[in-house]
C-alpha cells in the first residue's frame, strides 16, 4: 500500500511537471504575420521603408484630429477658427456641437477640450516615432556604412523638427523630447525660445543633406520633406521669430525682428533678412507664384510651381481625406453640383474686408 502511494505520487508529480512544461510552450505565441523588429532593418531598403517612409503615413489623416491638414478638429481648425480668418456659425441646429466651434472663435476652450488634447497626442506621437526611427538608423549605422544614411537621418530629423514647429506654434512652451526611451517623470517643459532655437538649428543642419527636389510632383519625392520644404519652414520661423522667441506674453517687453540675429550661411542676418534669404533660396530652386492662383487648388496640381509641400490625396492610393471643401458648401449648392455639403465654415467679414470686399478696391477674384 505504501509502495503504491509512492508510485502514484510520483506519477502525479511527473504529470503536473509535463503539464507545466506543455502550458509554458503553449503560451509562447508565434504568429505567422508577425516580424521580429530587428528583421525589419536588415538592409538599407528595409531601413528606409520602416524608419523613414513609414513616418509619412501620419502626414495626412482620415479621422478627427489626425494629419497635418485635411481632417476636422485638428491643426487646421485650431489655427483657423481661433482667428478672424473664418468662423463656423451655428445655423439652426447645425454646427453648435456643444459650443465647440463658438468656444474656438471666442477663445473659451477649456482644459477638457477633446480636440486640443487629441491634436497634442497626434503631434507627439509622430515626434516619438521619429525619435524611434533615429535610434534605429543609429543602430543600423553601427554595422553598416551605406551612402544613404546621412540623407535618411537628415530627413527624419527635419520631419521631427516640422512637428515640433506645429507643436510650439499651437502650444507655445512644450516638452522637448529627443528619445523614445525617456521616462514620463523625466519630461520637463522647455521655454518657447529654446524650442524655436532647436527647430531652427535642426532645419539649418539638415537642409543641405536633403534632396533639392519638388515635393509636390509625382515621383520618388512626392509628399516628402525635401530641401525646399526645409527652407520654407526656416522662412516661416524667421517671419514669426518675434512671437516664437517671446517667453512672456504678458509683459510689455517683446523681441524685435530687427534685433533678432541668425547665423545664415556664414552671414549674420536679422529676422527679416533671414526671411528674404530663405525665400530667395526657394526661388532659386524653381518656385514662383502661379499666374492663376486657383491653379494651386486644381485636382491635378502636381505641376504647380507655387505649392511647396502637399499631402497626397489620391483616393486609390491613400486614405488621406480633404474635408474642408464639402464642409463649406451650402446644401443647395452641393446638391446642384451633385456633391456633398455641410453648410459649415465661412469667411469672416473682417477677412473679406482685407481684400477690399464691397469697396472700389475689391479683389477681382470676388467677381
Label the predicted regions.
Residues 20-22:
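C-terminal motif of bacterial Sec signal peptides marking the signal peptidase cleavage site
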Residues 24-101, 174, 209, 224-367:
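An aromatic- and glycine-enriched ligand-binding surface/loop that stacks and positions planar moieties
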Residues 2, 151-154, 321:
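A general, composition-driven signal for non-globular sequence regions
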Residues 45-68, 89-171, 183-219:
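Conserved, well-structured interaction surfaces
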Residues 2-11:
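Bacterial N-terminal signal peptides that target proteins for export
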Residues 172, 178-180, 203, 241-243:
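Short, small-residue-rich loop/turn micro-motifs
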Amino acid at each position: 500500500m505504501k509502495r503504491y502511494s509512492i508510485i502514484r505520487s510520483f506519477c502525479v508529480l511527473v504529470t503536473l511537471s509535463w503539464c507545466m512544461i506543455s502550458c509554458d510552450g503553449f503560451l509562447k505565441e508565434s504568429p505567422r504575420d508577425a516580424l521580429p523588429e530587428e528583421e525589419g532593418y536588415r538592409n538599407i531598403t528595409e531601413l528606409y521603408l520602416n524608419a523613414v517612409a513609414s513616418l509619412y503615413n501620419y502626414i495626412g489623416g482620415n479621422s478627427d484630429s489626425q494629419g497635418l491638414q485635411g481632417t476636422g478638429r485638428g491643426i487646421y481648425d485650431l489655427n483657423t477658427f481661433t482667428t478672424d480668418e473664418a468662423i463656423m456659425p451655428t445655423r439652426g441646429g447645425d454646427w453648435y456641437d456643444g459650443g465647440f466651434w463658438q468656444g474656438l472663435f471666442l477663445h473659451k476652450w477649456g482644459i477638457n477640450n477633446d480636440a486640443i488634447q487629441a491634436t497634442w497626442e497626434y503631434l507627439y506621437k509622430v515626434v516619438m516615432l521619429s525619435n524611434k526611427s533615429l535610434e534605429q538608423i543609429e543602430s543600423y549605422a553601427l554595422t553598416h556604412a551605406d551612402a544613404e544614411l546621412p540623407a535618411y537621418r537628415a530627413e527624419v530629423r527635419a520631419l521631427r523638427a516640422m512637428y515640433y514647429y506645429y507643436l510650439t506654434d499651437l502650444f507655445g512652451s512644450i516638452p522637448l523630447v529627443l528619445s523614445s526611451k525617456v521616462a514620463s517623470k523625466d519630461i520637463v517643459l522647455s521655454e518657447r525660445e529654446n524650442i524655436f532655437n532647436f527647430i531652427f538649428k535642426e532645419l539649418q543642419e539638415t537642409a543641405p543633406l536633403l534632396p533639392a527636389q519638388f515635393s509636390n510632383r509625382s515621383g520618388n519625392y512626392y509628399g516628402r520633406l525635401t530641401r525646399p520644404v526645409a527652407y520654407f519652414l526656416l522662412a516661416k520661423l524667421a517671419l514669426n521669430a518675434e512671437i516664437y522667441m517671446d517667453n512672456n506674453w504678458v509683459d510689455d517687453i517683446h523681441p524685435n525682428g530687427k534685433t533678432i540675429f541668425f547665423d545664415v550661411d556664414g552671414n549674420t542676418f536679422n529676422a527679416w533678412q533671414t526671411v528674404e534669404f530663405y525665400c530667395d533660396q526657394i526661388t532659386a530652386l524653381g518656385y514662383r507664384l502661379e499666374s492663376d492662383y486657383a491653379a494651386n487648388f486644381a485636382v491635378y496640381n502636381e505641376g504647380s510651381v507655387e505649392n511647396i509641400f502637399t499631402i497626397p490625396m489620391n483616393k486609390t492610393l491613400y486614405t488621406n481625406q480633404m474635408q474642408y471643401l464639402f464642409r463649406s458648401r451650402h446644401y443647395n449648392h452641393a446638391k446642384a453640383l451633385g456633391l456633398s455639403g455641410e453648410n459649415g465654415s465661412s469667411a469672416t467679414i473682417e477677412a473679406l474686408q482685407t481684400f477690399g470686399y464691397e469697396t472700389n478696391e475689391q479683389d477681382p477674384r470676388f467677381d
